[in-house]
Amino acid sequence: MSSLPLLPATVIGSWSFPGWYARFCEDATRQPELFGADDREEAVRDAVRLAIEDQLRAGADLITDGEMQRVDFNLGFYDYLEGLRPLPQARRWGPPAHDQRSRYLCVAPLAAPRGLGLVEEYRRVRTLTAAPLKVPVPGPFTLAGCLQGGDVYRDRLEITEALLPLVNREMKTLVLEGVTFLQLDEPSFACRPDRPEEFLDLIARTVEGVSAFISLHMCFGNFRARAVGHRSYRPLFPHLARAAVQQLALEFASREMAEIELAREIRPPMGLAAGLVDLKNTWIEPPDLVAERLRTVLKYIDAERVHVTPDCGFSQTARFIATKKLAAMVEGVRLVRQQLTS
């Protein structure tokens, strides 16, 4: 991470789909016969290229591929898993909510003989940019949230145990490909904070043997810009500060910086990626406000251990808003960085 400046500005993972690409994804799902393999790859590459350009134009120091090949941040991975049967959607009408996401039934032991698709994503984005990259990886507990055990697994924890080695193997393969920064996405733990010691054990085994800088992202849900849990990290501390990762990526902006004092409990060498832009709000934060929020963060943790991010990924945000929010965030960071280094 030595190549990054003080207070690196970055995204969490996903970028907003361009309108044309969102339409392509819908059509490719409904009428797959309309597109060949080359057509699909061309569309994905063009979308990734735009995601890269948007992030770099805004001034981000560390970027992703925008998760352009994924559905939300984790739903696309079920296509790589064997042993699942899709379940019918119980509610199709009315206001969108988490119950309208895809659901699957486990009908055989879970396996991923082709991996989870992350290596292909990384190889593609590496051909398109030499910029510093991080790769978000869905955590096994969060992946288990859309699965029912059926006659194969007793409960969500057993499903998690089955997914854990698949995620671990994918992370190790990414490291062999040259990835140095991995982000483990486990928002479900923030929404179910009642078993913190069990959570720490699952995290430790998920990242065991993975030789990379690992960030642990825990928001409170952002499907259709809605949270899905009680928005407090307090039940997870001080346990969370002992997680077997190098950084915690946490949501603060949407909560008006509530609980930022918990950053005091994050001891070196662990760092904090502080969410300072609210993606549940279409209002564009002025750079001065981002700078003010960042100065608040620095009251509790030293600048050398801080990255600055939005609260969550941009997949649920219109692209024209996402570009403005990221640019404002970067400018707010620049103001504080200039103040600290002048």
Segments predicted by a language model, with ranges:
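Domain-level signal for soluble alpha/beta catalytic cores
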Residues: M1-S342
